[in-house]
Structures are given as C-alpha cells and as structure tokens.
Amino acid sequence: MVKVDGYEIPEGLHYSKDWFWVKIEGGKAKMGMTDYAQKQLREIVFVELPAAGGTVKANEPFGSVESVKAVSDLISPLSGTIDQVNPEVTGKPEMLNEDPFNKGWLLIITPSNLNDELAKLMDFNASVEWHKSLIAKG
C-alpha cells in the first residue's frame, strides 16, 4: 500500500478514472470506491445499489452515493452480472469512509468482457502516477 498525499492506494488492484477499484478473485470481480473518492465526498450518508442478479455495464451508472456534500453516480468499471451486493454498505453507508478497500466493497460481479475492459483500467503504478498528477493540479 502506498499513500499519495494521504490517499491510500493498495497494490494488487485495478483502478478506473471514475474512482473505482477492482479485485479479480477466481473469475469474479469485487468492486468498490477508492479512498480518494470517499475522502472527496466526505461523510457518506446513503448508498443506493442494484439487486443481485441484475447487470452492470462498464462506464455506466449503476447506483448512487449521497454525502453531506453531494449526490454522485457510481460508475461501473466493468460489465457483468451482479452476484453479490454488500448489505453492510447499504445498512451502514459510513463503511465506505471507514474501510473502502475491505469491508466497504460494493459489488461482486461475474464479468462478461473481462480481458478487454480490464486492459482499459489502470494498474497500481499507473494509479499512483495519476493520483499524483491530480493532486498537483489541486
């Protein structure tokens, strides 16, 4: 794990420019919001997620998150069928602020176009550099 200006970026994940991380585990993709995103939103008070069995499409909204600052769409980094929705996050939205990379995951999906879509995401090193460039811009 690396910290860039206080923002945690774990190794072994893929990252989208829409503030999502992806962890591939046995043909499934666990997805969640990055540390940078949750800190920008500040105190998260509500999360709306789709039901298991539905589908998500890469680069399209699948839910929303509400904070004391704003309401934001959740943009999926991958396409696929939703296997699991994290019930802890919908019942306790602050979990996204407290532990975005472990207990604060959002969905587990079976990807439908994994190789092509994964190639469009950033790896750990690219994500670190991207975060540095964002922070430098202010």
Question: Where is each model-derived feature located?
Answer:
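Short, well-structured beta-strand-loop connectors
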Residues: 51-65, 76, 81-84
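Short beta-strands and strand-coil junctions in structured, solvent-facing domains, enriched
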Residues: 71, 115-118
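Short, conserved beta-turn/loop elements at beta-strand boundaries and strand-helix junctions
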Residues: 24-27, 85-91, 116
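Acidic, low-complexity mobile loops and tails
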Residues: 1-58, 98-99, 103-113, 120-138
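Mid-chain, well-packed structural core segment of small domains
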Residues: 68-103
